[in-house]
Regions:
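Short, structured motif recognition centered on aromatic/hydrophobic residues
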Residues: 3-8, 19, 30, 51-54
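Short acidic/glycine-enriched loop/turn segments that link adjacent beta-strands
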Residues: 46-49
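An amphipathic, aromatic/His-enriched active-site/gating alpha helix that lines ligand/cofactor pockets
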Residues: 21-38, 56-93
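Short, low-order "capping/linker" segments at domain edges
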Residues: 93-102
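Absolute protein N-terminus
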Residues: 1-2, 102
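Residues at or immediately preceding the N-termini of alpha-helices
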Residues: 15-16, 60
Length: 102
């Protein structure tokens, strides 16, 4: 894993349970489409409207290929539509990170 896509979600705090369902759906979809899912993380203490996800890839090109597969994946389409219909995500930011190695 050379690149980590960190996704910061601003979510509706009154829709946390629905967002958690959305996140749980990705737990099988993302690996099936080629992402190395490090996890989805829900608010626990403190800020109640910020969630995170981290997904690893060998390269940015691998990320782009993953995004193409994800957009055509039937379960992925259903989950994207679920989030849109339920208005779970108010804002989404992606940052690409690299691991620090010895």
């Amino acid at each position: 894993m050379n690149v980590v896509c960190h996704i910061r979600y601003e979510i509706d705090p009154h829709r946390r349970a629905a967002f958690e369902e959305y996140a749980r759906n990705w737990l099988s979809i993302i690996p099936a489409c080629g992402g190395e899912l490090l996890g989805y993380f829900m608010p626990h203490e403190g800020t109640n409207n910020i969630a995170h996800a981290m997904i690893g890839f060998g390269s940015l090109a691998a990320y782009e290929a993953y995004r193409t597969r994800l957009k055509s994946d039937p379960a992925g389409k259903v989950n994207f539509e679920f989030a849109e219909r339920e208005r779970l995500i108010l804002r989404e930011e992606r940052t690409f990170l690299r691991p620090v190695r010895k």
